[in-house]
Amino acid sequence: MKSSCEKAIFAMWLLFAAAVVSPAQTFTNLLDFNFTDGAAPASTLIQATDGNLYGYTTEGGLDVCAGSCGTLFKIDDQGKLTTFYEFCKQGKLPCLDGMIPNGALIQASDGNFYGTTMQGGPNNGPNCPHGCGTIFRITPKGKLTTLYNFCSRANCADGASPEGALLQASNGKLYGETGIGGNGVQFGMGTLFELTLQGKLTTIHTFCANYPDCSDGIGPTFGLIQGRNGNLYGTAAEGGGVVNDRTLLYGTVFELKLDGTLTSIYSFCLSGYPSCPDGAYPVGQLVQATDGTFYGATNQGGTGPFGTIFKMTSSGQLTTIHAFQGTDGGFPSGIMQASNDAFYGSTDYEGANGEGGTLFLLNSVGFTTLYNFCSQSNCTDGSSPSVLTQGTDGVFYGTTSTGGNLNACFGGCGTLFSLTDGLHAFVEASPNFGKAGRKVILLGTNLAGTSSVSFHGTPATFHIVSKSEVITTVPAGATSGKIKVTTPRGTLTSNVKFRVTH
């Protein structure tokens, strides 16, 4: 636990972070996509209970969608890529199973994967002539079931074009967003929805329903998170006030109770574009860090004006902690908090090479550019990286939507890469909170010989499922803190503190 002095120092470096010279990291291009196995990967990768990485491509696969069918893929610990689903299985338009997957996959409590497609499905709308999108479930073996087709209601009142990753909340239900649709103005400004694992969808909020008052936001696109208080938090790409002529304003941060009550807690750039010192157009999922504060990014604005990284209290007090200047990257994609409590992120463009984007670190030393894409001729190392994910081996993984193999796609079909920064292997608890008696899945590496599990020093019973998965139970008397797992190769510690509830 940090002392009050340490907390003060932590706050100070966030406020005054400055660019510093990067120490040596190891960047490795693991593979180039070749269109047949997919193209334009755009999702944050996830690590599943089998230890493999999973993601999607927005293009490639079956050649029936003018290049935009999309695929789902997995990568094993040897770096082998397997395409385990290609969209538009029927081989012709319309793609009833969906097309252009969007938002990261999630693995739900039933072990299956869930995700969305922006287009496809049987229902067309004013802004989605090739289908208004789907929600799907797919088994680890690749059997896909469509759970919901959007625009199933008159005037797309249920939403259209879902965007961002789904979230499985503590009540077991899935929550997500659509970028358009709903009963608002001009074909709808987007919705928030709740979905059971059986496919029953309930629209719980419609954005800008009281046009021209769009203070709740317009176009949620990057997925929700569940805060420590049980409420959901997210961002809308635009909106935040009263729409004036064509001015859509510059985005919001909102809080959503599970009963559907939405509160806008921050509106960006109320001073008016381009003077947006607090940023404009929020991107990526919010992160509620180990200190309870929310962190996020905006795609534009700041003093650069190439976007910002910010922190914000639950009451809406926002502080800009870094403003991109172009040479350090521009137009960030989002951030994540790693096992060392530091923040890692990516930018879509700019950087030292003038294009391609960057990977960066924000820690107690300050802001550090870790890698500049397009460092190789013709951007064969990739360009426009996704938000990073950290594997339980301590290594960061990500994709780039362009660059790489120039022979298969104009400008490259995209890449998959890794970045090491000297971080150790760890275990990840899912969920990372719960009361005594709750089952918890521990993900890690080399867990087959696990000999003990403890919650902040309290021994727990456990069952070894595989080399990458152990199931344990929160023991009676446990207190909040790190989980430790003893294996033949040493002791692994959880990446975040497990929060014991009562």
Where are these regions (language model features)?
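Extracellular beta-propeller repeat domains
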Residues: K2-H502
